[in-house]
């Protein structure tokens, strides 16, 4: 175990004495003995003579927090923070310090998980409902989701949504030529495997001939032009096509919104609402539709329902659309969204209100008008919002260089055109410097009135009551207090790896040298960032045993998708494009099947044994049956059942022998680092979750980073980008070349500070804690799956099905009751219905792990009282959970259990009390009565 003065000792919860105590309960004498019993010998890495795991010897020795931050400061100072007037979907913004301090830098917000337990997630859900209301108001559409990964993927989702919703049979999509290049490229990526034909044209002239299921255009366009798309919308509808507009939300405070001109879908980004550019991300994309398309929306959708006392409460609505339920029939493969950034954007809108946003928009437009007035006839478009396109015949490079000399980056369109984008941070001095670069004198602006919007927006009190810093600070605290995040309790969610997100790892993400970089800035501005990215890629290669890594995918789902596209393109390059069968075990996460479907593959399910392992005979039969068309096997390792399958090498060999590729889902990599490398035991490609194994916080449901790691033969097919020729020539999956680059310093810092020994110790400790929980709880809740030697990996599944059958107490009852004990529930009913999957991670102390076990054992005692008939099935502390303070102080208490049993089942000194803000929520009511925007204040009376 690491010395107590190291960062690793701060990150890893149990000290050596605690680890020894847990190992004693497990029945092994050392961590190495535990690894030998749990991890199959055939794949387990052997330590070198000096005790270092293979691959990890390529990592630098561990640095202290001070040393790592000093190195990061050096990388940051190598960058140049120029004034960005590049635009193209990314704009500088002024983040209110009250939001920076109370959201982005606040662990109560950034360490939470996706709000699957809504009763203890009401703060986040309210903030996300504000986000949905903000987007719906500004776009003029009824329903928005919360949220998308970025603008480009939102456009791709808009395309597939329109195809699902279209009544016609056409497979053609019309895309306007003035759509952002990165957006058009991502749409093309998504269209290709789905058999969608894209027709790119200047749609100001109307739709081209032929049938289309959908149309995509931009408002304003990439050139800055504001086009009235009403005629195009009408024409498209007459011909049976739906229309999606990529709309700038700040511009929509002034111009007519998409919904008012009849558009069916609006998509875009909320980045300029207080979220730094961050060299490309993370930012919250958005997608809004008319109400009749609500069930076609991808991703998370927050709705209003009622709790057990009839009070309004929030929850995730219409979850049957999503990948974790519908698998390959889901509306999307998206799992992680961008919750933390959506909260930032929503609170930015709340802080400024409609009047403030409109004033910002007018100021931005005013600066653009000043530039246009000076340029005169060189301006290409008459109507624009923030971006001025100028003709400079043969002088583009000269103008760009002159601006650069003045500390400003402009956008070179071609030899003869330069684009200038203004934003919230633009000043009069910036405008003057731009005019000098063009060699023109200031002129009196001529008003180009673009304010055609008449509809009100952001009228709900959520956007009018919090204009002072005091009010906003208290609002954010009130919301945070309604949730359970890692700052209050362990979150033992299986398959989610809710480990520590250390303050030292988080600190650099707000440094301007990282945060204020445009993703298309000149490479000369970002050498430090590029070196950081190179370091992280090399370290991940060393850890995983692969040969190349792309950091572009901004979620695990996108990493999966990128990996499957690389496999498809590899087969095609060898003259085998017909290989389209993807084998997936029945136990797999739903994202696997959804990603395979999006990649144009046909999913064939492989059976599993009763012990959770892949049925090797069934696999071989399926491989033989589909040998000529076999593309891929997707398999999670360790398995989704929380064990190390001993047949993994044979499984990989069977697929390779048939010409297929093996996709090892890296969701559970926290159980492998320093112990085994997927790139060495049979994997051809994996996605990794930096927001699990490598400490990027979950943010309440995003951001995430899902790098894709490959063997050398797949490296040429990794994601490329239209504005990054240095990348491979594969197809882009994210709007920015390096995805959510501004949070990569978190994982860089984690690896740099842990070092080889610390990383291996983290995996071993995670396995130890999981096996300790399995031993302590097996007597009360049988552990469903173990490996050959009776061991689990880094998580264990508790089987409640016999308990439910005998007593009527459900897994839902236990999950809700845990909130009364102060804990977030483990993962419910995945991968097996009626079970709980527990993953403690290495960061939790033995004291916290024991408290969780004590709570579970006490709950089993309550279940036994129900089973014995002491409490009715329909009226007991479990079925009544969670209990609010309000329900306990009512005059009438007609339950067979006491108020003290309800609120303090293990006494008042057990742990700090968490008061759930609402009772159990009626999910079915919320889906039947869909409300996805802020409810009126009267609803809470």
From Swiss-Prot:
Modified residues (N6-(pyridoxal phosphate)lysine): 692
GO biological process per UniProt: glycine decarboxylation via glycine cleavage system
Cofactor list: pyridoxal 5'-phosphate
Catalytic activity field: N(6)-[(R)-lipoyl]-L-lysyl-[glycine-cleavage complex H protein] + glycine + H(+) = N(6)-[(R)-S(8)-aminomethyldihydrolipoyl]-L-lysyl-[glycine-cleavage complex H protein] + CO2
Cellular component GO terms held in the UniProt record: cytosol; glycine cleavage complex
Family annotation (InterPro entries): GcvP, GDC-P_C, GDC-P_N, GDC_P, PyrdxlP-dep_Trfase, PyrdxlP-dep_Trfase_major, PyrdxlP-dep_Trfase_small
Entry keywords, A to Z: Oxidoreductase, Pyridoxal phosphate
GO terms for MF: glycine binding; glycine dehydrogenase (decarboxylating) activity; pyridoxal phosphate binding
EC number(s) reported in the record: 1.4.4.2
Pfam families reported for this sequence: GcvP2_C (PF21478), GDC-P (PF02347)
Family assignment from sequence similarity: Belongs to the GcvP family.
Protein role: The glycine cleavage system catalyzes the degradation of glycine. The P protein binds the alpha-amino group of glycine through its pyridoxal phosphate cofactor; CO(2) is released and the remaining methylamine moiety is then transferred to the lipoamide cofactor of the H protein.
Subunit (UniProt): The glycine cleavage system is composed of four proteins: P, T, L and H.
HAMAP family cross-referenced by the UniProt entry: GcvP
Entry-linked PANTHER family: GLYCINE DEHYDROGENASE (DECARBOXYLATING), MITOCHONDRIAL, GLYCINE DEHYDROGENASE, DECARBOXYLATING
Name used for this protein in its record: Glycine dehydrogenase (decarboxylating)
Organism expressing this protein natively: Mycolicibacterium paratuberculosis (strain ATCC BAA-968 / K-10) (Mycobacterium paratuberculosis)
